[in-house]
């Protein structure tokens, strides 16, 4: 099972505050474990604009018509002071990994220097922190009915209203997440 470029959709019974009603975009999944970013948990009072101001990033070619007041997401409980930028593919950044034909992840400052300019990727989602699973841990959580999985849809990552992402990701499976009982059993 390789879940790279998939969504993990928290089951209604998952009560961990970081992951309750969350959608995690899996950036990497291999024999050693998995790494992903929560895409639907905004950090209150933190926008892309505020992050750029704090880092004193102000490119000369900034286009003020570009909305930088987008919220920054909490990507997960690990390395919460590190930025991870999901974006549509655009070459030239120093620390980027292509995840799919539609998504890349970049962790280097050079991508931040393009935000709000004609040089930025077409679509972006900025997160602070990430989540990861050790070898076999994610598979175990899926077997325990903590997560639903489905192929990722970049439209949900970049365009869907944040409050709708959990429901919309589940609808990719043809289900209404609100109709799932909080406790699942095994037959």
UniProtKB/Swiss-Prot annotation:
One cellular component (GO) term of this entry: cytosol
Protein name per the record: UPF0301 protein plu1183
Disulfide bridge map: none
PANTHER family in the cross-refs: UNCHARACTERIZED PROTEIN YQGE, UPF0301 PROTEIN YQGE
HAMAP family: UPF0301
Pfam families: DUF179
Annotated InterPro entries: AlgH-like (IPR003774)
Membership in a protein family: Belongs to the UPF0301 (AlgH) family.
Highest taxon above the source species: Bacteria
Organism in which the protein naturally occurs: Photorhabdus laumondii subsp. laumondii (strain DSM 15139 / CIP 105565 / TT01) (Photorhabdus luminescens subsp. laumondii)
């Amino acid at each position: 099972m390789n879940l790279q470029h998939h969504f993990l959709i928290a089951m209604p019974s998952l009560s961990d505050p970081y992951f309750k009603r969350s959608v995690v975009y899996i950036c990497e999944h291999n024999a050693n474990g998995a790494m992903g970013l929560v895409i639907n948990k905004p950090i209150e009072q933190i926008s892309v604009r505020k992050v750029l101001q704090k880092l004193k990033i102000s490119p000369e070619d900034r286009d003020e018509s570009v909305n930088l007041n987008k919220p920054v997401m909490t990507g997960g409980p690990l390395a919460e002071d590190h930025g991870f930028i999901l974006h549509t593919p655009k070459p030239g950044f120093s620390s980027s990994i292509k995840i799919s034909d539609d998504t890349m992840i970049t962790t280097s400052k050079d991508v931040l220097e393009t935000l709000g300019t004609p040089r930025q990727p077409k679509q972006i989602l900025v997160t602070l922190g990430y989540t990861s699973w050790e070898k076999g841990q994610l598979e175990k959580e899926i077997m325990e009915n903590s997560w639903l999985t489905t192929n990722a849809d970049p439209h949900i990552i970049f365009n869907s209203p944040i409050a709708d992402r959990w429901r919309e990701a589940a609808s990719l499976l043809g289900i209404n997440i609100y109709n799932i009982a909080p406790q699942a059993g095994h037959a």
